[in-house]
UniProtKB/Swiss-Prot annotation:
GO terms for molecular function: toxin activity. Plasma. The keyword NADP does not apply. It is found in: Secreted. GO terms for cellular component: extracellular region. Belongs to the bradykinin-related peptide family. Smooth muscle contraction. Probably plays a role for this system in cardiovascular regulation in fish. May target bradykinin receptors (BDKRB). This is Lysyl-bradykinin-like. The keyword Ribonucleoprotein does not apply. GO terms for biological process: vasodilation. Keywords: G-protein coupled receptor impairing toxin, Secreted, Toxin, Vasoactive, Vasodilator.
Length: 10
C-alpha cells in the first residue's frame, strides 16, 4: 500500500 500523495511520475 502506498501512502497518500505518493507520486512516482512526479
Amino acid at each position: 500500500k502506498r501512502p497518500p500523495g505518493w507520486s512516482p511520475l512526479r
